[in-house]
């Protein structure tokens, strides 16, 4: 597996003329909830305008692109790792597991997997063969399929935080999305933690005296 600091869509021809799956994650930093990943294979005959790193898009634009990706992509799948798995494996290995689940869930086998960041797990096709994969630093702003994956993962996790907010409104999940903000720390200090918290993360461990 190679690591690339810069890559354009045209460069992909050097890797593959077949189907390419882009993979990205969201939710490594929060204290609560799953780490969520997505794998997306775009349809080259149905281009999507405005794809970019999900963090650089407004919520309204992300939501609109989410719907367009779901409608136009050849296939996509969301993979995740639970707080219990994060605590057992650590956040890095849990993220790699979630990425593997995202790719394994695609109903079309890609010939190449491109992952945002500086590392990638081993991906295996349904027939047991290892898939070719490359990691691309800042790939979510360079490669359309990775951008699409970042949007699918981000919108999926944000919606899940909104659901959690409805169940536990005293924590303010709709605003901070589970990240370690001052308001979140204050809510934890007042109300404690529940089973969706990542007990291996230092602020949660400190509160629990672990």
UniProtKB/Swiss-Prot annotation:
Q: Which cofactor does it need?
A: Mn(2+); Mg(2+)
Q: Which InterPro entries match?
A: RNase_HII (IPR022898), RNase_HII/HIII (IPR001352), RNase_HII/HIII_dom (IPR024567), RNaseH-like_sf (IPR012337), RNaseH_sf (IPR036397)
Assigned keywords, A-Z = Cytoplasm, Endonuclease, Hydrolase, Manganese, Metal-binding, Nuclease
Kindly indicate whether the keyword Lipid biosynthesis belongs to this entry.
no
UniProt keyword annotation of Signal present: no
Question: Which Pfam families does the entry link to?
Answer: RNase_HII
Q: Which SUPFAM superfamilies does the entry link to?
A: Ribonuclease H-like (SSF53098)
Top-level class of the enzyme under EC nomenclature: hydrolase
Question: What is the name listed in the Swiss-Prot or TrEMBL entry for this protein?
Answer: Ribonuclease HII
Q: What species is given as this protein's source? A: Shewanella baltica (strain OS155 / ATCC BAA-1091)
């Amino acid at each position: 597996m190679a690591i690339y600091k810069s890559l354009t869509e045209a460069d992909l021809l050097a890797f593959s003329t077949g189907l390419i799956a882009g993979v990205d994650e969201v939710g490594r930093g929060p204290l609560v909830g799953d780490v969520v990943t997505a794998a997306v294979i775009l349809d080259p005959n149905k281009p999507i305008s405005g794809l970019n790193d999900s963090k650089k898009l407004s919520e309204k634009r992300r939501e609109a692109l989410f719907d367009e990706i779901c409608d136009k992509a050849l296939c996509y799948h969301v993979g995740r790792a639970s707080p219990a798995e994060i605590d057992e494996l650590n956040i890095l290995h849990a993220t790699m597991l979630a990425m593997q689940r995202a790719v394994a869930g695609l109903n079309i086998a890609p010939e190449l997997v491109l992952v945002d960041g500086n590392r990638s797990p081993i991906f295996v096709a349904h027939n047991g063969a290892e898939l070719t994969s490359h990691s691309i630093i800042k790939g979510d702003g360079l490669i359309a399929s990775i951008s699409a994956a970042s949007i699918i993962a981000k919108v999926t996790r944000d919606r899940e935080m909104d659901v959690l907010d409805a169940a536990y409104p005293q924590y303010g999940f709709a605003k901070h999305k589970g990240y370690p903000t001052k308001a979140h720390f204050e809510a934890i200090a007042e109300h404690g933690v529940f089973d969706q918290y990542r007990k291996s993360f230092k602020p949660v461990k400190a509160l629990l005296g672990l």
